[in-house]
Amino acid sequence: MQRILMAPGQSCCALAILLAIVNFQHGGCIHVTSSASQKGGRLDLTCTLWHKKDEAEGLILFWCKDNPWNCSPETNLEQLRVKRDPETDGITEKSSQLVFTIEQATPSDSGTYQCCARSQKPEIYIHGHFLSVLVTGNHTEIRQRQRSHPDFSHINGTLSSGFLQVKAWGMLVTSLVALQALYTL
């Protein structure tokens, strides 16, 4: 058996790298999908939250309209508090759905709708794609689009590509500092 001996300073550097990697993994597999369906004048906006059993605790799923900068449970159209299902294991992905229904769509229902999820423990904020709804007379047009503004990724705690980029850069910088410390010892 081969043993690797490290100087006291080197073990701290190795610990810093390990902590950065563990922190980068945080966030699990929680994600949001949204869709829309129409029957006559009725419009159903469906938000689906995919999560594992232990990730459900404290999650709130909600719909917002024309409010991309302040979409929160306090400013929502409708919300659902996700409950932990004791019947499921911690491995299987489970879905929770929130359907926002507009019984008879009118031009005042036109706008940009977004489904989001938020948790307090740990602080997680996930926002889904936008659904653009345009109601003119008897015609309703629905389009799904990606987030178009890059600043969405700067919202504190947001699990988005911007959030993961910040985490990756943090891990890279921490690793480089640790390697430099190892090199100077």
Swiss-Prot record:
Taxonomic classification: Eukaryota, Metazoa, Chordata, Craniata, Vertebrata
Cellular component, GO annotation: extracellular region; plasma membrane; side of membrane
Subunit organization: Homomultimer; disulfide-linked. Interacts with classical and non-classical MHC class I molecules. Interacts with TNFRSF14 (via cysteine-rich domain 1); this interaction is direct. Interacts with LCK and CD247/CD3 zeta chain.
Lipidation (GPI-anchor amidated serine): 160
Protein name listed in UniProt: CD160 antigen
Organism: Mus musculus
Observed phenotype of the null mutant: No visible phenotype.
Alphabetical list of PANTHER family matching this protein: CD160 ANTIGEN (PTHR15425:SF0)
UniProt propeptide residues: 161-185
GO molecular function: activating MHC class I receptor activity; kinase binding; MHC class I protein complex binding; MHC class Ib receptor activity; signaling receptor binding
Top-level taxonomic group: Eukaryota
The entry's keywords: Adaptive immunity, Cell membrane, Disulfide bond, Glycoprotein, GPI-anchor, Immunity, Immunoglobulin domain, Innate immunity, Lipoprotein, Membrane, Receptor, Secreted, Signal
